């Protein structure tokens, strides 16, 4: 409210309706100094939402290159605004983006099975 964004930006807070929210987005903007592998970025790509990410998000997190633009925080507000404008003009098939995420090795079925196996192996060695 202080910044006068209430008509342009929605701050959801906690929600259990992430897929519905992602489907409604025009763009996903994620400025960050440093990240590991942010699930929200992966979910946005899987939903086919154009993403603008900081270079603080590792390239490993870019599963859908045609839907993602990365730039440094130091590029400034103008460069970020331009990147958001480009994201808003991107047109691609959301199903194609979801397929790209699966093909990149981030399918929940594959990663859940791998993680289960990893923990079971770890438990056996203890």
Where are these regions (language model features)?
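Nucleotide-activated donor-binding/catalytic signature segment of Leloir-type glycosyltransferases, i.e.
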Residues: 1-13
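An anion/phosphate-binding loop that grips the pyrophosphate of nucleotide cofactors and donors
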Residues: 25
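A charged, aromatic-enriched C-terminal amphipathic alpha-helix characteristic of glycosyltransferases
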Residues: 91-124
